[in-house]
Regions:
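Conserved tyrosine-mediated DNA breakage-rejoining catalytic core shared by Y-recombinases
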Residues: 126-165, 233
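Catalytic-site neighborhood detector that most strongly recognizes the C-terminal catalytic loop/helix
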Residues: 147, 227, 233-252
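C-terminal catalytic core of tyrosine-transesterase DNA break-rejoin enzymes
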Residues: 112, 116, 208-230, 237
Length: 257
């Protein structure tokens, strides 16, 4: 997986899926049959996104295993998962404001990086003061995203100042870990869950950013790039159309010439 330049987070996820499945099947990979694997996954109440991710992990593992050990690939039986198109779920601003009011400065910054700059949990974890840039238009942050891809996101003066103020001396990490590096994406996700009222999460802060960014300029391609999506179709799942735009669209259908 490292040879394919997969991110450490993706590698950890793939390994976790394979290990969980191995514990559930209680046998060596060479003993797994297509019927066993299909029966096992069919008992899991996974949402479509989780199921899609698990199937991808298992298909990759068994493709490698069957190639190395000349073994029938049982994962070929796994069907294609139809991924749903969930509605955007931006956190209401009043709930976000309440959560921010009770935060320490560092915890507040974690929420703001997702809500005001659209960062994923893994991207928040990797924020470093050295990634702040400035030009004639203001400050920006170099974001280290999925698949080792980078993007540049404009940030406010206040956000830039908070990043610099809270950065660990010497390393520049805003969320330093115990080993001289940074915390894990899971740590940031759990932090968000502890600070936000249920069912709101760090991911719904990204939805909030996408919705507000689109409402400001109605430029879906710009929002796509800000969020770091590979396609506009993904961005559409993050953006709740402004109510005034929905009303104008509906009203236009009421006119009969």
């Amino acid at each position: 997986m490292r040879a394919r330049s997969l991110s450490p987070e993706t590698i950890r996820t793939r390994l976790q899926h394979v290990r969980t499945t191995a514990r559930g099947l209680e046998c060596a990979p060479s003993k797994v049959t297509p019927e066993m694997l299909l029966e096992y996954v069919s008992t899991k109440p996974w949402q479509s996104e989780t199921r899609h991710s698990y199937y991808a992990s298992l298909k990759q593992f068994f493709a490698w295993y069957s190639r190395i050990y000349r073994y029938e690939n049982p994962a070929l039986v796994l069907p294609t998962v139809k991924r749903g198109s969930p509605m955007p779920r931006p956190i209401p601003d009043n709930l976000l404001a309440e959560a921010l009011a009770g935060c320490t400065p560092r915890h507040r910054l974690a929420l703001e990086l997702a809500a005001l700059a659209g960062l994923r949990s893994g991207e928040v974890a990797r924020v470093n003061a050295g990634d702040i840039t400035v030009d004639l238009l203001g400050y920006s942050l170099v974001v280290h995203g999925k698949g080792n891809k980078q993007r540049v996101v404009p940030i406010t003066d206040d956000l830039a100042a908070a990043i610099r103020d809270l950065a660990e001396p010497g390393t520049g990490w805003v969320f330093p870990g115990a080993d001289g590096g940074h915390v894990t994406p899971r740590w940031i996700s759990k932090l968000g869950a502890s600070l936000l009222p249920s069912p709101w999460t760090m991911h719904t802060l990204r939805h909030r950013f996408g919705t507000h960014a689109y409402a400001g300029d109605r430029d879906l391609v710009a929002v796509q790039r800000l969020l770091g999506h590979a396609s506009v179709s993904t961005t559409q799942r993050y953006v709740e159309p402004p109510s005034d735009a929905m009303r104008r669209a509906a009203n236009s259908a009421q006119i009969i010439d």
